[in-house]
Curated annotation (Swiss-Prot):
PROSITE patterns: FAD_PCMH (PS51387)
Coiled coil: none
Gene that encodes it: murB
Organism taxonomic ancestry: Bacteria, Pseudomonadati, Pseudomonadota, Gammaproteobacteria, Enterobacterales
GO molecular function, one term: UDP-N-acetylmuramate dehydrogenase activity
Assembly mode: Monomer.
Organism: Escherichia coli (strain K12)
FAD-binding PCMH-type domain residues: 13-183
Entry protein name: UDP-N-acetylenolpyruvoylglucosamine reductase
Amino acid sequence: MNHSLKPWNTFGIDHNAQHIVCAEDEQQLLNAWQYATAEGQPVLILGEGSNVLFLEDYRGTVIINRIKGIEIHDEPDAWYLHVGAGENWHRLVKYTLQEGMPGLENLALIPGCVGSSPIQNIGAYGVELQRVCAYVDSVELATGKQVRLTAKECRFGYRDSIFKHEYQDRFAIVAVGLRLPKEWQPVLTYGDLTRLDPTTVTPQQVFNAVCHMRTTKLPDPKVNGNAGSFFKNPVVSAETAKALLSQFPTAPNYPQADGSVKLAAGWLIDQCQLKGMQIGGAAVHRQQALVLINEDNAKSEDVVQLAHHVRQKVGEKFNVWLEPEVRFIGASGEVSAVETIS
């Protein structure tokens, strides 16, 4: 139990694992999983650890997925990319722009690996992965069987996919297929992007604006450990939203296609005057209330207590109960984040 997980999670929480293995191809990943499983150990497959909170020491093997490679197929209507799960997401965004293949610019600077992107259906500034995903290649861990799911079969939802449900723990993502249409259409619905002129804007300008918004609002994990947005933006019924807006008319709200309404968790937290609030070594970030940071050698229990406090305060004021976006990892695998902080 002496392999530190601190370098393998962006929160910088110091817990240990029994074994840590880096897998650079599918076979190494399968071998590591099968060996650990035969020993009766739990196994956790990790990308860059940018969306996890380790609650305690992990009693098993952590496999770091470092399967690399980018293949490009140039078709008349679009560029098709086949990207290894271990590639860094932001580096991929930069690479596609440099190569004149726009479409990912709204998703710039999202931390983590390409293989993690479908699990959460990552999204930012009006674009989600499902907009550009063609397929996801995974491997069934017990049999080594390769499975390709179309974007539809991935059952993407808000920060959700089949990989959080039926496919969790049984399959490992090894590659993601992306489709970037040659007829580029900017998405300028959020934040500073609304100020850009859709008739003249370039992909590089969108990329620059997104990077500027993220770097000014979000803490650098190398300075203050964090896992990005700690909570999901709550999606509520139209009735709930109407009641809330009659009391708080300035509350940011985003009507969804199905009639529900997405609220801004950061705004709700901010209204409770929680920016800068600290418990132990964990704090609510002063610029972006949606982010909890490791201010000073935080322990996982500091983060859990702080998240509980934030959830309670928002729930009491707005009757909206936040759910963590970050995944909570216990001694033998993922546990319910909502139950942990309730």
